[in-house]
């Protein structure tokens, strides 16, 4: 449990008003600074309050990080003299903690050598790295068509049951294998059941060990749907603080946020409780500032990088809603998961035509990679345009050129699938991590017609093109 700083003389106040998650505290002596953590006990538990406003007459308005039911007027509150401090370091791997750094996985206390404040400034311009580099994930469809920037921000869009969690776990696994990096997962305002499932799936698929310890690759920080808005508005910052520590140790860190919309939603609830006048669609007037302050901390420095994958819920599928629209401004790439692709049994169900990346630029990825990616997309686009004709008239009515394009597109679709390490438990087929050179070489051969003689089935759920050729031989022999 994080120790509280020893209260200073004159830094003990008393509760004067409790309205839901907002608690007013009067101090006689020195007032605590904005964003300082105050502590009191509530129903026998430690309750942390974060200072949000100075109201005058020695009263501060605070936001509770846990339920305020049971607080009474006149109750003593101590100023810790610092912002919320959370444990950071390798001891956090394989563990689940809450917004104030307390372990919630019933695996004993979380003791670390270092603690860090959740509010930090973004790295200065001098510390930031300006190089554009790809973070190779070993997932063909991502690396070829919508590559991730090292230290970039990626938006992950997808409905329920199309494989967001499996993709997230595979990314955690591959980054640990290929880059030796750790991952931090921040569960912001999502279902507790999903958080529980993710924890157990990580143990089953060897991403984490039970109770942490050697071999664990990810730290989990949860502030789920049932938490008060104060916790949901800050839990992403807690996760980010853990990730920043790993980055400053020279690591390439993956930072997952599920769901970034809930961060904004919690900020909106807190803003209303603090009495701020709402802005467009009822959101907080500080929406862009809140988002910017968090997103600017996610970056590459000269020592290491934080690459962030953020699941984004789009309310009522309205992309112009201020919450998703504000997050789009910060993204370098988007990975869109499609139900229609998942229905074909192609996993990962990434939509090759809808997913985008600013890294797909010949100046960054090189001329060959860019040309191959564009050819793959144009072949798939042509197939999409011909699907109506095929549905009405059948394949026989197509020209010879179109028939070849359709055959290649179907092979490309299947070759974009690949077996995942974390899904070995369910599929029985060993996972594949494909090098970028092999991915480019394989798809280059496909679009140039070098593999037109191989059957479609040979390309399904394989890693490199060599495996597809081997599979074709086995199919022919069968």
Curated annotation (Swiss-Prot):
It comes from the Bacteria. Its main location: membrane. It is found in: Cell inner membrane. Keywords: ATP synthesis, ATP-binding, Cell inner membrane, Cell membrane, CF(1), Hydrogen ion transport, Ion transport, Membrane, Nucleotide-binding, Translocase, Transport. Its EC number is 7.1.2.2. ATP binds at residues 158-165. CDD domains: ATP-synt_F1_beta_C, ATP-synt_F1_beta_N, F1-ATPase_beta_CD. The keyword Membrane applies. One of its GO terms (cellular component) is proton-transporting ATP synthase complex. GO terms for molecular function: ATP binding; ATP hydrolysis activity; proton-transporting ATP synthase activity, rotational mechanism. Produces ATP from ADP in the presence of a proton gradient across the membrane. The catalytic sites are hosted primarily by the beta subunits. Belongs to the ATPase alpha/beta chains family. This is ATP synthase subunit beta. The gene is atpD.
């Amino acid at each position: 449990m994080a120790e509280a700083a020893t209260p200073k003389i004159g830094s003990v106040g008393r509760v004067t008003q409790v309205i839901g998650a907002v608690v007013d505290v009067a101090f006689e002596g020195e007032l605590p600074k904005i964003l300082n953590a105050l502590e009191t006990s509530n129903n026998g538990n430690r309750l942390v309050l974060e200072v949000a406003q100075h109201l005058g007459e020695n009263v501060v308005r605070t936001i509770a990080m846990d339920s305020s039911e049971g607080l009474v007027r006149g109750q003593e509150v101590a100023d810790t003299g610092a912002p919320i401090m959370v444990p950071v370091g390798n001891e956090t791997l394989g563990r689940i903690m809450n917004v104030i750094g307390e372990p919630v996985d019933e695996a004993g206390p979380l003791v670390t050598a270092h603690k860090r404040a959740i509010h930090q400034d973004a790295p200065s311009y001098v510390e930031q790295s300006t190089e554009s580099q790809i973070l190779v994930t070993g997932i063909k469809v991502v690396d070829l068509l919508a590559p991730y920037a090292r230290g970039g921000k990626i938006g992950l869009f997808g409905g329920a049951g199309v494989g967001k969690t499996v993709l997230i776990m595979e990314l955690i696994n591959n980054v640990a294998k290929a880059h030796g990096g750790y991952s931090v997962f921040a569960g912001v305002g999502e279902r507790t059941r999903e958080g529980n499932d993710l924890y157990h799936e990580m143990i089953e698929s060897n991403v984490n060990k039970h109770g942490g310890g050697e071999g664990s690759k990810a730290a989990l920080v949860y502030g789920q749907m049932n938490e008060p808005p104060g916790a949901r508005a800050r839990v992403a910052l807690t996760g980010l603080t853990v990730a920043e520590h790993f980055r400053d140790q020279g690591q390439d860190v993956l930072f997952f946020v599920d769901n970034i919309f809930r961060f904004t939603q919690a900020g909106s609830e807190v803003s209303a409780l603090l009495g701020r006048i709402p802005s467009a669609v009822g959101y907080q007037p500080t929406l862009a500032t809140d988002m910017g302050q968090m997103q600017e901390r996610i970056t590459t420095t000269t020592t290491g990088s934080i690459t962030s994958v953020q699941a984004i819920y789009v309310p009522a599928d309205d992309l112009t809603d201020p919450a998703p629209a504000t997050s789009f401004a910060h993204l370098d790439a988007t990975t869109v998961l499609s139900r229609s692709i998942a229905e074909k049994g192609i996993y990962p169900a990434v939509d090759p035509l809808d997913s985008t990346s600013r890294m797909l630029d010949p100046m960054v990825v090189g001329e060959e990679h860019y040309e191959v990616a564009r050819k793959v997309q144009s072949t798939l686009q042509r197939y999409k345009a011909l699907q109506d004709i095929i549905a009405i008239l059948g394949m026989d009515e197509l020209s010879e050129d179109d028939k070849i394009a359709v055959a290649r597109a179907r092979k490309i679709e299947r070759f974009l699938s690949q077996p995942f390490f974390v899904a070995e438990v369910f599929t029985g087929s060993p996972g594949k991590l494909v090098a970028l050179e092999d991915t480019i070489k394989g798809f280059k051969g496909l679009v140039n017609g070098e593999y037109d003689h191989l059957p479609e089935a040979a390309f399904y759920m394989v890693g490199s093109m060599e495996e597809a050729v081997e599979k074709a031989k086995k199919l022919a022999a069968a």
